Swiss-Prot record:
<comment type="function">
    <text>Component of antiviral defense system Druantia type I, composed of DruA, DruB, DruC, DruD and DruE. Expression of Druantia in E.coli (strain MG1655) confers resistance to phage lambda, SECphi18, SECphi27 and T4.</text>
</comment>
<dbReference type="InterPro" id="IPR025639">
    <property type="entry name" value="DruA"/>
</dbReference>
<protein>
    <recommendedName>
        <fullName>Druantia protein DruA</fullName>
    </recommendedName>
</protein>
<keyword id="KW-0051">Antiviral defense</keyword>
<dbReference type="GO" id="GO:0005737">
    <property type="term" value="C:cytoplasm"/>
</dbReference>
<keyword id="KW-0963">Cytoplasm</keyword>
<dbReference type="Pfam" id="PF14236">
    <property type="entry name" value="DruA"/>
</dbReference>
<dbReference type="GO" id="GO:0051607">
    <property type="term" value="P:defense response to virus"/>
</dbReference>
Length: 404
C-alpha cells in the first residue's frame, strides 16, 4: 500500500518546525555548540543560571497567574517585612502541609517567588512550612520526595550495587524544595532550614506516613526508615549548605557534583510539543515509562523525541553542574543502606526546636548584628514579578486584618 504523499509532507513540515523551535530556544538562552558538537552553556555564574531558568520561570508564573491574583493579597500577611523580625525573639517551628488547605496555597505561592523554579516532587512527599512563632511570619519551606534512581555521587558514597539500591532506595528521600524567604534569608535562615532536614520531626513523620510502604513492583512491605536525605544546590556550588555543623554534628555533607545532564533548558511548552510528537508516533515514552512518570521519565521522553528528530544525545547535557549534599539522619545510614543490616543509630538526632535554638545562636542572631540591612526589606517586594494591574494588595494597615 502506498502512503499518501500529503501525510509524509505534513510530518516532514512538523519535524522541521519542531527542530527549528528547539534550536531557536536554545540559542535564545545563549547556548552554543562546541567544535565536537557538544552543547555549551553561556557560563556557570548565579546570574547565568537564573537567566537560563528565566523562560521556565515565566511559564510557571503565567500558568499560575489566576491563582496568584486570587490568593496573594490574602496570603501576603504571612510574609515578613524586616521591621517585623526581632532576631533574638525568632522562634522557628515546623508545620506539615496537607493538600487542599490554605497552608498548601501558602506553600505554593512562596515557592513561586524563587528565581529558579522548584519541582513539584514525585511519588512520596512531605511538605513543611517553617514559621517564626514570635510574629506568625513564614521563615521558609521544606519539601522532600522520592529520589532519582540514578545519582552517581550518592551511589558511589553508599557503595551499593543495583540490587541493593533497588531494595533500599525506599529509605532515602530528596529535598526538592529547601530554603528561607526574605528577610530571614539575609539572616542565614537558609542554614537553619537546611539543618532541619536532619530532625527527629521529619524522621518520625516519615515513619508514620511511609513506614509501611509497599513496593510498586514487588508489592512487598519495605519497612522504610528515613535514613538519609539528599539535596542539590540550584546555583552550582552552595555557600549556604557547605560546612553545616552545629555542636559537632554535621547536618549536610557535600558529596560531589551532578554530571550536568537534565531537561531544565527544555521548558514545559516545548516538552509538551515533543511529547505530542512522540504520542502521534505511538512511542512508548509519550505517556508513561515503566512504573512512574517522575524525573527519569521526563528526561527519557525528551531525549527520545530529540533523537527521533535527529539531534544527538548530548543535547540533554546542559553543562550546569550542581553540588550534591547528603544529610544522614542515622549515624550509620550509609552502612545500613549498603548492607541492609543494623538498626539506625539516632543518638545525635535532635528535635526541630533543639536544632533551631542552636542555629539561632550560631548564625542568625550574630548575622543580624553584623548586617542590619534586613530591616529595610518590605514584604511587598517579594511580589515584584507580578504586574501591579493584576494584583491588588490591601492598604498596609489592613494587611493584618485580612482573612484567609
Amino acid at each position: 500500500m502506498h502512503k499518501d504523499p500529503s501525510i509524509i509532507v505534513n510530518i516532514n513540515l512538523r519535524e522541521a518546525k519542531l527542530k527549528k523551535k528547539v534550536r531557536e530556544h536554545l540559542q535564545s538562552l545563549g547556548f552554543t555548540r562546541s567544535d565536537s558538537g557538544a552543547l555549551q552553556a553561556p557560563g556557570n555564574t548565579k546570574d547565568v543560571i537564573r537567566a537560563l531558568h528565566s523562560s521556565q520561570r515565566a511559564e510557571r508564573i503565567f500558568a499560575n497567574q489566576k491563582f496568584i491574583t486570587l490568593r496573594a493579597a490574602k496570603l501576603i500577611k504571612f510574609f515578613a517585612s524586616g521591621n517585623e523580625v526581632i532576631p533574638d525573639k525568632i522562634s522557628p517551628v515546623l508545620e506539615r502541609v496537607k493538600s487542599g488547605t490554605w497552608q498548601g496555597d501558602l506553600f505554593r505561592l512562596a515557592a513561586l517567588t524563587w528565581s529558579v523554579p522548584v519541582s513539584s516532587g514525585f511519588g512520596r512527599r512531605l511538605r513543611y512550612l517553617v514559621w517564626d512563632e514570635s510574629n506568625g511570619k513564614l521563615i521558609g519551606l521544606i519539601a522532600i520526595g522520592d529520589p532519582v534512581f540514578n545519582l552517581a555521587v550518592r551511589d558511589n558514597l553508599i557503595g551499593w550495587d543495583t540490587h541493593a539500591r533497588s531494595s533500599r532506595l525506599v529509605n532515602l528521600m530528596d529535598a526538592y524544595v529547601l530554603g528561607a524567604l526574605p528577610p530571614y534569608n539575609a539572616l542565614l535562615g537558609g542554614k537553619l532550614i537546611a539543618c532541619l532536614l536532619r530532625s527527629r520531626d521529619l524522621y518520625d513523620d516519615f515513619a508514620k506516613v511511609y513506614g509501611d510502604t509497599v513496593g510498586v513492583i514487588s508489592q512487598k512491605k519495605k519497612q522504610a526508615r528515613l535514613l538519609a536525605i539528599t539535596t542539590t544546590s540550584s546555583m552550582g556550588r552552595s555557600s549556604v549548605y557547605n560546612r553545616l555543623k552545629l555542636d559537632g554534628i554535621q547536618y549536610l555533607k557535600s558529596i560531589g557534583y551532578t554530571g550536568g545532564w537534565g531537561h531544565f533548558h527544555i521548558p514545559d511548552s516545548l516538552f509538551i510539543e515533543l511529547r505530542d510528537y512522540l504520542r502521534d508516533m505511538d512511542h512508548a515514552y509519550a505517556d508513561h515509562y515503566m512504573f512512574g512518570n517522575g524525573p527519569n521519565w521526563r528526561l527519557r521522553t525528551t531525549k527520545a523525541a530529540l533523537n527521533v528528530l535527529g539531534f544527538r544525545d548530548n543535547l540533554m547535557k546542559h553543562g550546569i553542574q550542581r553540588e550534591v549534599f547528603i544529610s544522614q539522619l542515622a549515624e550509620n545510614a550509609t552502612s545500613i543502606l549498603q548492607t541492609g543490616k543494623g538498626e539506625p543509630d539516632l543518638t545525635s538526632l535532635l528535635s526541630a526546636k533543639e536544632i533551631a535554638e542552636c542555629a539561632m545562636a550560631r548564625w542568625m542572631v550574630p548575622r543580624s548584628i553584623r548586617n542590619p540591612e534586613y530591616r529595610l526589606w518590605k514584604a511587598r517586594d517579594l511580589f515584584d514579578f507580578i504586574s501591579n494591574d493584576s494584583l491588588k494588595f490591601p492598604p498596609s494597615d489592613e494587611i493584618a486584618k485580612t482573612v484567609v
